[in-house]
Amino acid sequence: MGEEWSATCANCGYFFFVREGGGFFFHLLHCDKCGKEKTVSFDKLGEVHLRYLKGLKGPYCVASSNHDKEVQKTFQGDPISEEEYFKVVESLVRKCRCGGHYTFSSPPRCPKCHSPDVIKGDMHVNYD
């Protein structure tokens, strides 16, 4: 699932927090140009998310395990791989205002100068 950790920009020295991963019912993508966050609800993804769940070997997470197992048992659509799923999700999200694209793999960036050169700090929280 998701996590949050403190960071300091190696370029400008700005201190900030980075959130990655997402949650029980949404994904968290970042802009590949400025680092801005974008949440994408599983409900808004509709059938493509159900196809992804269908292809998993187990539930997506503990919080949705009953739902996920039911989808895996009863959903009639074809399963989709994680790679295919990520491509579809990224294609459905609008471009960032800065002109960049929201992706699952974008590195954390400083919110002040947008540098990807960040130093991971000691404060860390896992969201499972």
PLM features: what roles do these ranges have?
Residues M1-G21, L28-C31:
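General detector of N-terminal leader/presequence modules that precede the first folded domain
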Residues F24-K33, V48-K54, K112-H114:
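Short, surface-exposed linear segments at secondary-structure transitions and domain or protein termini
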Residues F15-F17, E37-V40, G100-T103, P116-V118:
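Cys/His-rich microdomains that often coordinate metals
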Residues G2-W5, E20-G22, E37, S41-L92, ...:
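Short, intrinsically disordered terminal segments enriched in charged and Pro/Gly residues
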Residues G77-D78, V93-K95, G99-Y102, C110, ...:
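Low-complexity intrinsically disordered segments
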Residues C9-C12, C31-C34, K95-C98, C110-C113:
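Short cysteine-rich clusters marking metal-coordination/redox-active sites
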Residues E4-S6, F26-L28, E90-K95, G99, ...:
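Residues immediately within or flanking Cys/His clusters that coordinate Zn2+
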Residues E20-L28, H101-R109, H124-D128:
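Short linker/helix segments within small regulatory modules
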